[in-house]
Amino acid sequence: MRVIESENELRLTCSRSASGGIALLRCETQDDIVRLPDEIDGVPVTEVGAYVLSERVPDLTGKDTFAVRITCGGTEPKHNAAAIRTVTLPKDAKSVGSYAFYNCRNLERIELTDSVSEFGGGALMNCMSLREVILHAAPSAPTCLPRLLGEYAGELDVRFDEHARLLFPEYVEELEDLSPAHIFQRRIHGAGYSYRQCFDGGALNFRQYDAALSELLERHDFSVAARVAVRRLAVPFVLSDAAKADYLAVLRTHGGNLAQSCAKAGETAALTFLLSLGVLSAADVDAACTSAREAEQTAALSVLLSAAGKTQSKGRAKSFEL
């Protein structure tokens, strides 16, 4: 068995792909932070197979495989899909197989590059903890993001490196049985489905994405609208003046609740940015201070008290600086 020193304890089952790269067919690990290898013996990993990290073992009968041990000096792992919290895919991976992360119930983050063009059905089934996708790609370029979002109906925070940050809200899809004919009618609840349609040929259409804010407001999903707004304003990639004004208006009306949530969670960077926009009233800041005190978030409280002091300073405008 080939043994490679790295930062993880992994047991890999691999094969040669038709393109000449390496197909990673199975990865067994107990690690919470998993970085799949970019290459093995100088050959790039180009395929991530079906059920590769899932709870279920893939059927590899009849395949010509070889084993690779990735180690940082520990013992050989016994696979535990529930232990996995973050996964970084190989930088040259072109495809992710069906059910790749099936039943990885505690998976919170996936990191991948724009080389991935295929994202298999069921790849994120039962990944109920997934919250973040980091995509190393240009925000305006075609990527696998539409396929990935199509596999996950929950709320997702998506980052294109440092170039753009977006929130895709959740939605719920259900089939209603129209008895006695037993005709099933598809019903979709939540604005997240509309946000997932904002793509042209695999590339995100930012104009459509920003226009989808109106549906959130019509649905009175104000807390979600505030979270969408603060992300777009923080990293304003191709943000029009009109869309910027709409997002600022949302935060003037509903930013107070967001500030309280950030204060309770101790998210000082988010609080500092929100304060810098000048959208919070004195009452909003006071309420956030109360939330920080109750949660014993002293750093967040310090940020808020400093801002409250600035708003009360004689002759100072009600705005905040980073």
Where are these regions (language model features)?
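Structural signature of tandem-repeat unit edges
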Residues: 2-22, 28-46, 57-95, 105-118, ...
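Ankyrin repeat structural motif
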Residues: 49, 98, 267-275, 297-306
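Short low-complexity, flexible loop/linker segments enriched in glycine and/or proline
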Residues: 125-126, 147-150, 297-299
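Ankyrin repeat domain, specifically the short helix-to-loop turn at the C-terminus of the second helix
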Residues: 241-245, 273-280, 303-311
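Hydrophobic/aromatic side-chain positions at a characteristic register within alpha-helices
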Residues: 262-266, 293-296
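Alpha-helical oligomerization segments
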Residues: 283-322
